[in-house]
């Protein structure tokens, strides 16, 4: 073959190889404008192709179809007919209602209807010839089961998975149109989509296309009236709360505020409702200024004489008039604060944002969010009391399971949920569950937010682990607790996995830390024991929790994800330089490649914090190669401008876990309260610590005590003393003998096994200690002067 032909052939093979390595193969250049938007060669080179349906294990030839998989073919056909009528090339369906909360009423489960995924988090995107769902790690396994093979599963955050706008740019032409309902997408998200999709058009469509096609089997809207949360539970009148809010607005640069989050309306006015299952809220909006206080709610929800008396001084308007009346309300304001997305709070919808005159818009987190998170004394003590009652109910059910399951009495996942509802209802001022119980036996426990159904309901046996995550709503507080149990003889692997999770749980729970510590920075403490074994879990470690409110309450979120700090990369060099002690913890850390640098700082400081000490500099910095001594971007330090600091009487969860797909799941979750602590050091009032709120024993048979540190053992034993004092006394008061006996058996002190006696007497041991001590001193002298 001539040399020139050989070179041409090699060049062709090389180009084909590059095409196959790029993200989406050859680029179709259909219009002159397409040339302006071609991704650069560098952007496309060596990028993984986007996921496809054929890559899903459950969609391969011969795969078993899960019993809970939903057939969406007819629904997609109907939706695409509507898309054609409105000249829409892609339609985005979120999980939200008009208030952008995490949980929505069944009537608003539009995303679940179109795709079949029943988890609380996810976004569906439908084009004329494809459909994809983005969801987070809590729902990867669940989505694989529930999504039929019309759907591409986009595992958000995983390598090679594009975000929504990147995928749409990949599959659409620049002259096509993407649409969504502007009342169901938060402003921050809408603006990001609009910017990232350009030049593809992203337009609001007020006709909701899912509503058009969802004509049968749609759950009705709740009609139950709202009710008052009286002062003995709320601890502060709504009038005083409004006064505090009005005083805060000028500090935020505004003289008016839109409130769209349901839990913020409920908290501010001391009212509750039943419009969202497990969340005591009613559908409502508010507008607040120095002279205006307007509540938009269904008249039937607030029409009782008692409610009308309670709301004296509040202007009341129909719920569905909110967006239409906003322009008139805002006329007298110079600047209107519109809530932005913040942690678990979705912020105001784009429709609400758009209704405020452009020159008067101030988009930032709602000040009500921060006010609500700081529990007053009555709320804080109510939370403690609610968790005490809840512990009695939960222990009662667990003790019954421990008694009956080994005897062969049938218990399945749905029965556990039903029994928990029944036993919690026996406690004072209980108002049902705070979320749908997660009761997963064996492989079901590995589905992080598993929800048992008639199709998946498993009988609980004695060979695998049982994960139980549940909570209750009470007038005096909201609870959330997870314990992992075993009703037989666990394997060594199960014990090791459980103990690793427990170690992380304990290390976070017993932390002492400066008051300026950012919440996300303590996450690594809970994960470190798992990291050391090459393990991790795909969810946050902790979340804020409301007072007779939301199970996930902003602003507290203990999780590794952040948009500010930098992740570590291979061959980064940085310093590890805490003061006051020998810093082994950080140096021996094993951690995921996505870990943010600042998140490991607390490992180096924790031993000092425990003694009321600290050092006033960063723990580590990047270092150059024959260059800068302080090299960007690596900086290991507690300071940050994004996450939130803890405040006294914040309540949040501590819930590390481990999930072995197809085998079992482990999670241990307790609620902690932030309280001050003092030391006789140069930093006397610098520190917070956590107070245990959840008072439920750990599973003794799953704990390998030899893996625990002395500090961890001491913490568990002190915790068990508290559990006996508080919960044991309440059980005695309520005559719950079975639960009490189980509680006592589970809270015996943890003790290390006695060492095996090899026949060496105490006297001989003392002799040998003396010999080794003298030998060490002699060696030290020799080496020192050698």
Regions found by a protein language model. Give the residues of each.
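Hydrophobic or amphipathic alpha-helical targeting/insertion segments
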Residues: 129-133, 150, 163-221
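C-terminal GPI-anchoring signal of eukaryotic secretory precursors
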Residues: 754-774
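Cleavable N-terminal signal peptides of Sec/SRP-targeted secreted and luminal proteins
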Residues: 5-24, 770-782
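Conserved mixed alpha/beta core segments that line enzyme active sites in large multi-domain catalysts
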Residues: 98-114, 121, 228-284, 438, ...
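Flexible inter-domain linker/hinge segments
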Residues: 63-64, 212-254, 260, 374, ...
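Intrinsically disordered, low-complexity, positively charged segments
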Residues: 73-112
